[in-house]
């Protein structure tokens, strides 16, 4: 199954990279997928079971856990990783497949992964 995404620009390149990644990465009930979505202001992390098409756990900088949070965007991303690891362990999830969503494994995306590892989640 090949996905053809045509065009130029950052958003198109991001979608092309993500489509390439998704050919190899998929979440199962035993090993769900940790998806990281990055915007200019916020970070969203979701743990997804692709066989059922269900989001098992999610965490974001938009949730009430971040009310009054003061720090850099990278520190917030690390906290998102720690919080999703805690929620995953409460749901009985110990290991996941990391899906960087076409973004480089650098900066805030890497901070989410680092926070999840420190929270006890195996990537």
UniProtKB/Swiss-Prot annotation:
Could you tell me one molecular function GO term of this UniProt entry?
A: 5S rRNA binding
What GO cellular component entries does it have? cytosolic large ribosomal subunit
One GO-annotated biological process of the protein: translation
A Pfam family annotated for this UniProt entry: Ribosomal_L18p
UniProt keyword annotations, A-Z? Ribonucleoprotein, Ribosomal protein, RNA-binding, rRNA-binding
HAMAP family, alphabetized = Ribosomal_uL18_B (MF_01337_B)
Q: How does it assemble?
A: Part of the 50S ribosomal subunit; part of the 5S rRNA/L5/L18/L25 subcomplex. Contacts the 5S and 23S rRNAs.
Family, as annotated:
Belongs to the universal ribosomal protein uL18 family.
Role: This is one of the proteins that bind and probably mediate the attachment of the 5S RNA into the large ribosomal subunit, where it forms part of the central protuberance.
What is this protein's name? Large ribosomal subunit protein uL18
Organism annotation:
Bifidobacterium adolescentis (strain ATCC 15703 / DSM 20083 / NCTC 11814 / E194a)
Gene encoding this chain? rplR
């Amino acid at each position: 199954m090949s996905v053809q995404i045509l065009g130029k620009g950052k958003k198109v390149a991001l979608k092309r990279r993500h489509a390439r990644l998704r050919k190899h990465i998929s979440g199962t009930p035993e090993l769900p997928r940790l998806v990281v979505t990055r915007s200019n202001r916020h970070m969203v992390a979701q743990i997804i079971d692709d066989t059922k098409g269900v989001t098992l756990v999610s965490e974001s900088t938009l949730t009430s856990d971040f009310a009054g949070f003061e720090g850099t965007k990278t520190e917030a991303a690390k906290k998102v990783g720690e919080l999703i690891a805690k929620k995953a362990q409460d749901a009985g999830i110990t290991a996941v497949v990391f899906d960087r969503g076409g973004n480089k494994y650098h900066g805030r995306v890497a901070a989410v992964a680092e926070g999840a590892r420190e929270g006890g989640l195996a990537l």
